[in-house]
């Protein structure tokens, strides 16, 4: 937050990882305290910087389930959704699909896995309320056109990340997705203070 203020940003979103992320997931029991911390920061920086409490929820099943129950939605100013290899799936069979077979299939661009992954994303978009789809295609090959059409229909924006390894689709695919009318969000995807607000590479990509 201090880095955002020093860079004269008007607003910063601070999304934690969802609870099933095995490396960095936040417990639902921590939400009340986190909400209070964000509210205090907004008082501290009032008129200078707006701090949004967010969560990067995890896609955890082929049926499109997320690891954030709808009842907790009120805690967040902004909710993101993405797929992470470190997120714990709901069943053992999905563990095989999500964490073992699919990363291998990604390298071969298996059509079967592309279809399954796309269907899981489409179900997630249709069944859940969230604001931004983050790093689509990371670890899972996707049919981007179908994803973009669903995002446009349900009012979900797609991320263009300044973090190179999180920007999976290419310029031509981006142009095709833009034709659906879907909105894009450019962000730094910063994990360190020095990365906050560094979005020029994502802007350059979008302008091409």
Question: What are the residue ranges of the model-derived segments?
Answer:
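Histidine/acidic-residue-rich catalytic or RNA/ligand-binding cores of hydrolases
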Residues: 24-25, 142-151, 167-180, 193-207
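Short acidic/histidine-rich active-site segments
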Residues: 17, 182-197
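Extended substrate/RNA-proximal surfaces in nucleic-acid metabolism proteins
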Residues: 22-153
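Non-catalytic positions within long, well-ordered alpha-helices that form the structural scaffold/packing
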Residues: 5, 72, 125-126, 178, ...
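Divalent metal-coordination and catalytic microenvironments
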Residues: 1-4, 16, 51, 79, ...
């Amino acid at each position: 937050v201090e880095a955002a203020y020093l860079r004269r940003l008007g607003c910063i979103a601070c999304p934690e990882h969802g609870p099933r992320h095995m490396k960095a997931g936040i417990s639902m029991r921590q939400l009340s305290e986190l909400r209070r911390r964000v509210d205090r920061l907004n008082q501290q920086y009032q008129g200078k910087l707006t701090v949004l409490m967010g969560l990067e929820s995890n896609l955890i099943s082929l049926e499109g389930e997320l690891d954030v129950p709808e009842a907790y939605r009120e805690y967040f100013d902004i909710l993101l959704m993405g797929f992470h290899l470190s997120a714990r799936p709901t069943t053992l069979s999905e563990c095989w699909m999500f964490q073992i077979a699919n990363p291998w299939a990604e390298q071969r661009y298996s059509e079967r896995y592309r279809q399954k992954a796309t269907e899981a994303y489409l179900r997630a978009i249709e069944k859940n309320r969230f604001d931004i789809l983050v790093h689509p295609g990371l670890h899972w090959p996707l049919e981007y056109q179908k994803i973009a059409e669903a995002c446009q229909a349900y009012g979900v924006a797609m991320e263009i990340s300044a973090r190179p390894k999180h920007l999976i689709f290419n310029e031509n695919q981006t142009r095709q997705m833009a034709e659906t009318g879907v909105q894009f969000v450019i962000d730094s995807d910063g994990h360190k203070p020095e990365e906050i607000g560094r979005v020029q590479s994502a802007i350059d990509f979008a302008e091409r």
